[in-house]
Structure formats: C-alpha cells, structure tokens
C-alpha cells in the first residue's frame, strides 16, 4: 500500500510539533525517495538545507540562487513522487486530505489555515522548483511560529 511518507507537510508537522525537534536535520531526508531525488538533481545531502535554516528564512540569505533552485527541485521531486504535484501544479485537495489524515487536524485548525495560506501564496508561481521551496519554507515557518506560540501558552 502506498503510504504518504513523502508528504512534505507531514514532515513539517513532525519536525516542529515534536518535542525533540532537530533543526539540523535536512529537509525531506527521512523519506523513501530522498536519495532518488538527490541523485536525479545531482545533489548530495550536504547540499540540502536544514530544517532550521528553512524555518528561520536563513536559507534565503545564506545561499546562492542556484542552491535555492536545486533544493526546490528536490522538494518538487518528493512532492511529485507522492502524487501531490504534477510539474508546477499542486493537487490542493489531495494535499489537504493527506495533511488532515496524517495529522488528525480538524476543520479550523491553524495548521490547515497555514497550509491553505501557503498554497494560496505560491499558486501562481510558474517555476516548479522555486514554487516547491517557497511552499515548503512557508509551511515550515508557519509550523515554527505555531509551535513557539503553543509553547509560550
């Protein structure tokens, strides 16, 4: 049975909702097609941004545009292999359904609102790689903010 382990939004939830967050972990590194996507795009694990870099936005200032694009291509590859993207197009309903199924989020949950906002923010981007990285960064940043606000509460 095909699992949804590549679902990048679940990755964001696990990364930031977990009490033992590992901000040094590479985005997408725990998924089955990670090595395949790295190989397809000519990257090594050292080339991939960490969760901490992406959630804080440091990836935008610490890396060249070509590195940003290549990381985005790896994210797009993971999303596409899980059937959540085709080229530069999201399957928004499938993303929501998978996210809800995997996280147990309920209607009105701030995580779903964040996912929807991130998809809306990126929907008109045409480059599939850039679009994927911006989407992932948006979700990771939102998850970090939500995790911080719930820890403070």
From Swiss-Prot:
Localization terms from the record: Secreted
One GO term of the biological process aspect: response to pheromone
A Pfam cross-reference name: PBP_GOBP
Sorted UniProt keywords: Behavior, Disulfide bond, Pheromone response, Pheromone-binding, Secreted, Signal, Transport
Disulphide connectivity of cysteines: 37-77, 73-129, 118-138
A single GO molecular function term of this UniProt record: pheromone binding
Signal peptide region: 1-19
GO CC entries: extracellular space
Membrane-traversing stretches: none
Entry-linked SUPFAM superfamilies: Insect pheromone/odorant-binding proteins
Subunit and interaction comment: Homodimer.
Family: Belongs to the PBP/GOBP family.
Record's function text: Colony queen number, a major feature of social organization, is associated with worker genotype for Gp-9. Colonies are headed by either a single reproductive queen (monogyne form) or multiple queens (polygyne form). Differences in worker Gp-9 genotypes between social forms may cause differences in workers' abilities to recognize queens and regulate their numbers.
Protein name stated in the entry: Pheromone-binding protein Gp-9
Gene behind the chain: Gp-9
């Amino acid at each position: 049975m095909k699992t949804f382990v590549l679902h990048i939004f679940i990755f964001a939830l696990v990364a930031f909702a977990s009490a033992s967050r590992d901000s040094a972990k590479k985005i997408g590194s725990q998924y089955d097609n990670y090595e395949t996507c790295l190989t397809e795009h000519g990257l090594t694990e050292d080339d991939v941004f960490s969760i901490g870099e992406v959630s804080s936005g440091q990836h935008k200032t610490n890396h060249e545009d070509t590195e940003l694009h290549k990381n985005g291509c790896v994210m797009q590859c993971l999303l596409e292999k899980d059937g959540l993207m085709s080229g530069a197009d999201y399957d928004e309903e499938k993303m929501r359904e998978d996210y809800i199924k995997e996280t147990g989020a309920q209607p009105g949950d701030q995580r779903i609102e964040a996912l929807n906002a991130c998809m809306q923010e990126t929907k008109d981007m045409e480059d599939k790689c850039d679009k994927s990285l911006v989407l992932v960064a948006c979700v990771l940043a939102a998850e970090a903010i939500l995790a911080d606000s719930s820890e403070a509460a």
